[in-house]
Swiss-Prot record:
GO biological process, one term: cytoplasmic translational termination
Subcellular location: Cytoplasm
Annotated function: Responsible for the release of ribosomes from messenger RNA at the termination of protein biosynthesis. May increase the efficiency of translation by recycling ribosomes from one round of translation to another.
Principal place of residence: cytoplasm
Name of the protein this chain belongs to: Ribosome-recycling factor
Chain residue ranges for the region called Disordered: 135-162
Matching PANTHER family: MITOCHONDRIAL RIBOSOME RECYCLING FACTOR PSEUDO 1, RIBOSOME RECYCLING FACTOR
Organism: Sinorhizobium fredii (strain NBRC 101917 / NGR234)
InterPro entries for this protein: Ribosome_recyc_fac (IPR002661), Ribosome_recyc_fac_dom (IPR023584), RRF_sf (IPR036191)
Length: 186
């Protein structure tokens, strides 16, 4: 196993933490409608819980409106119930086989609460990145101890791992700042 491959693996795992963070913050509701808002909603369907996007089509016809087209008309009630019980503060309006969901304006308190959730997601991602860094550093120490690489090579690799970690954490901070600005925008 060469050290270059190990660095690529560490980078892949760190990029995975960024991707997970992007997914987490995409589901946070901002002032604009986004189909991702309904990602956490699961519906009791056909004897099991299913993600909403597996029983309906979600569209954004207007900036403050979501439209959910349920594929099976017998599921409309279950989808309505799931959205109401999801703690997202949304109240669908049933219109035949479709549900229209007006998105209310976010008040200051709700905005601050969403920013706090975004910070929690960011911290969770940073912890994951630091775990990857620790795994990389432990691997380098072991390789040095086993005599696979020299002390100079180990130090150089450690610096590269630290630089990679710093870059990934600053990317998470940048994404967080963007999302925070988007949430607080009235």
């Amino acid at each position: 196993m060469s050290e270059g491959v190990e660095l690529k693996e560490l980078k892949r795992r760190m990029d995975g933490a960024i991707a997970a963070f992007k997914h987490d913050i995409a589901s946070l509701r901002t002032g604009r409608a986004s189909a991702n808002v309904l990602d956490p909603v699961t519906v009791e369907a056909y004897g099991s819980r299913m993600p909403l996007n597996q029983v309906a089509n979600i569209m954004v016809p207007e900036p403050r409106m979501l439209s959910v087209s349920v594929w099976d008309k017998t599921m409309v009630g279950a989808v309505d119930r799931a959205i109401r019980e999801s703690n997202l503060g949304l109240n669908p309006i049933i219109d035949g086989q479709n549900l229209r969901i007006p998105l209310p304006e976010l008040n200051e308190e709700r905005r601050k609460s969403l920013v706090k959730v975004a910070h929690d997601y960011a911290e969770k991602s940073k912890v994951a990145v630091r775990h990857v860094r620790r795994d990389g550093m432990d691997g380098l120490k072991k390789a040095e101890k086993d005599g696979d690489i020299g002390q100079d090579e180990s130090r150089a690799q450690s610096e590269r791992v630290q630089k990679m970690t710093d870059e990934v954490i600053s990317e998470i901070d940048r994404l967080l700042a963007e999302k925070e600005k988007e949430i607080m925008q009235v």
